């Protein structure tokens, strides 16, 4: 996990340039921020799209008023391209760990579970214990230009819908609900800011 490696560097007072996803939770993000401040260390999260010419051109167009006031924005990805929303629980098979994989190191701070190719490589993104789903995986790339161009900060409202509804998950009563859904729609409402009107941004995946 990036947060674990980043924390180890920060505690040694080393500057950190960390790739996304920087953390797995909000609490981890806050802990990294506090540690960086404590040691006076410069940090930055990498996002290659933010350095691209396309993002800068978008900002210039919006800031110059080329397309007028923006009150609605949409962001979409075809993710997940890995198995998601499976209501089958964890794999029961326990195949051997590949010889070139340190499974304990790979798990990091996540709870212990046997190795299975349903998690690694790549498919870990779909599991709550390891990934952040489609929004966490691609949102920082796709939504970043909108945040930059529209000078967005914190939303005043958020509404989410998914392709699956599992009341038991929120009560931690059903062990089968450990994966992110196949698709989601998330609507964010942002207030007026810096001469720009209120804007609604909708995230679509699946």
Show where each model-derived region lies:
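Oxidoreductase and adenylate-handling cofactor-binding alpha/beta cores
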Residues: 52-75, 89-92, 136-165
């Amino acid at each position: 996990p990036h947060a674990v490696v980043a924390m180890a560097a920060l505690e040694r007072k080393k500057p950190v340039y960390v790739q996304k996803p920087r953390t797995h939770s909000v609490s981890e993000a806050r802990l990294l921020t506090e540690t960086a401040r404590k040691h006076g260390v410069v940090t930055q999260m990498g996002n290659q799209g933010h350095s691209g010419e396309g993002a800068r051109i978008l900002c210039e167009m919006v800031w110059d008023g080329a397309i007028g006031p923006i009150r609605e924005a949409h962001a979409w990805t075809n993710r997940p391209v890995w198995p998601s929303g499976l209501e089958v629980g964890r794999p029961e098979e326990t195949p051997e760990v590949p010889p070139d994989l340190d499974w304990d190191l790979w798990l990091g701070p996540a709870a212990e579970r046997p190795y299975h190719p349903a998690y690694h490589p790549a498919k870990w993104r779909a599991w709550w214990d390891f990934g952040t789903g489609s929004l966490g995986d691609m949102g920082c790339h796709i939504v970043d230009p909108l945040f930059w161009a529209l000078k967005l900060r914190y939303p005043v409202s958020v509404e989410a819908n998914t392709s699956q509804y599992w009341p038991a998950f929120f009560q931690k009563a059903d062990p089968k609900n450990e994966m992110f859904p196949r698709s989601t729609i998330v609507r964010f409402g942002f207030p007026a800011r810096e001469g720009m009107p209120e804007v609604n941004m909708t995230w679509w995946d699946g």
